[in-house]
Amino acid sequence: MSALTRLASFARVGGRLFRSGCARTAGDGGVRHAGGGVHIEPRYRQFPQLTRSQVFQSEFFSGLMWFWILWRFWHDSEEVLGHFPYPDPSQWTDEELGIPPDDED
């Protein structure tokens, strides 16, 4: 019997949740936290107005990016150009080049 009373209480709570969910979707209950208007006015085909802080930050991070790119290119250029050294042709053997031995005439 206690299982039935627990089941009935769950059904009651579920019914309340379902009813309150329907009311919220219909707009009858709940709290709206929106301001009601557009927070940022659109500026069609106009440049955004930047603050001095935004300009400073953008120039700082742009300079930092280019410093890092040029520093890495100067000190670790093999990362960009490839890190395998070009082989010295004077060390290649005739067999590697496909040249037959001299005693074969």
Swiss-Prot record:
One Gene Ontology term, aspect cellular component = mitochondrial inner membrane
Q: Where is the transit peptide?
A: 1-33
Coiled-coil annotation reads none
Q: Which membrane topology term applies here?
A: Peripheral membrane protein
Q: Which GO terms describe its biological process?
A: aerobic respiration; mitochondrial electron transport, NADH to ubiquinone; mitochondrial respiratory chain complex I assembly; proton motive force-driven mitochondrial ATP synthesis
Compositionally biased tracts (Acidic residues): 93-105
Q: Does the keyword Cytoplasm apply?
A: no
Q: Does the keyword RNA-binding apply?
A: no
Using the UniProt annotation, give all residue ranges assigned to the region (Disordered). 85-105
Q: Which UniProt keywords apply?
A: Electron transport, Membrane, Mitochondrion, Mitochondrion inner membrane, Respiratory chain, Transit peptide, Transport
Its family remark reads:
Belongs to the complex I NDUFB2 subunit family.
Q: Which PANTHER family match?
A: NADH DEHYDROGENASE [UBIQUINONE] 1 BETA SUBCOMPLEX SUBUNIT 2, MITOCHONDRIAL, NADH-UBIQUINONE OXIDOREDUCTASE AGGG SUBUNIT
Name of protein: NADH dehydrogenase [ubiquinone] 1 beta subcomplex subunit 2, mitochondrial
Question: What organism does the record attribute this protein to?
Answer: Homo sapiens (Human)
What is the gene name? NDUFB2
